[in-house]
Amino acid sequence: MDLPGPIHEILVLFLGFVLLLGGLGVVLLTNPIYSAFSLGLVLVCISLFYFLLNSYFVAVAQLLIYVGAINVLIIFAVMFVNGSEWSKDKNSWTIGDGFTSLVCITIVFSLMTTIPDTSWYGILWTTRSNQIVEQGLINNVQQIGIHLATDFYLPFELISIILLVSLIGAITMARQ
């Protein structure tokens, strides 16, 4: 969407705030149904970010795939689980939980301080991709591949790590 600057900034700040609240809801709510609905809110906010960035296809794909399929599947699976199992486990924090929280907070703060100080445009891969694209000897599919392997390398790797962690979590939950 081509919005005026102040309106665009207000929408980005509002969506970011709702995204943070939804993320906290996913983590902090003890009822898994409420947590799944918070995840749906987070995924809808991400889709709205894509709309603001004029990437309509990715926004609709985000809504259809993640909100429409995966989140509904999560809610469906949670409803099959016996509700009394969730309320029985009222353990307080253990040493392992505290250690894991400390490690996660340390990683988040180190990334928050490292990423803004890195000059991503000075990386050799991005200059190579511009030279290859300027030659015009490749088609659109190859250009997408080059951009995924060069310009969008960091987001692509972060998404793969998130998918790996979710796969490990799903396997762990299935074994129990």
From Swiss-Prot:
Bilayer disposition of the protein: Multi-pass membrane protein
Coiled coil regions in record: none
Keyword Ribosomal protein: no
Residues that span the membrane, as ranges: 10-30, 33-53, 60-80, 95-115, 152-172
Taxonomy, superkingdom: Eukaryota
Uppermost EC category: translocase
Annotated GO MF terms: NADH dehydrogenase (ubiquinone) activity; quinone binding
Keyword Nuclease: no
Pfam families from the UniProt entry: Oxidored_q3
E.C. numbers: 7.1.1.-
Reactions listed under catalytic activity: a plastoquinone + NADH + (n+1) H(+)(in) = a plastoquinol + NAD(+) + n H(+)(out); a plastoquinone + NADPH + (n+1) H(+)(in) = a plastoquinol + NADP(+) + n H(+)(out)
Location relative to the cell: Plastid, Chloroplast thylakoid membrane
Gene Ontology CC: chloroplast thylakoid membrane
Alphabetical UniProt keywords: Chloroplast, Membrane, NAD, NADP, Plastid, Plastoquinone, Quinone, Thylakoid, Translocase, Transmembrane, Transmembrane helix, Transport
Family: Belongs to the complex I subunit 6 family.
Role description: NDH shuttles electrons from NAD(P)H:plastoquinone, via FMN and iron-sulfur (Fe-S) centers, to quinones in the photosynthetic chain and possibly in a chloroplast respiratory chain. The immediate electron acceptor for the enzyme in this species is believed to be plastoquinone. Couples the redox reaction to proton translocation, and thus conserves the redox energy in a proton gradient.
Subunit structure: NDH is composed of at least 16 different subunits, 5 of which are encoded in the nucleus.
Name of the protein this chain belongs to: NAD(P)H-quinone oxidoreductase subunit 6, chloroplastic
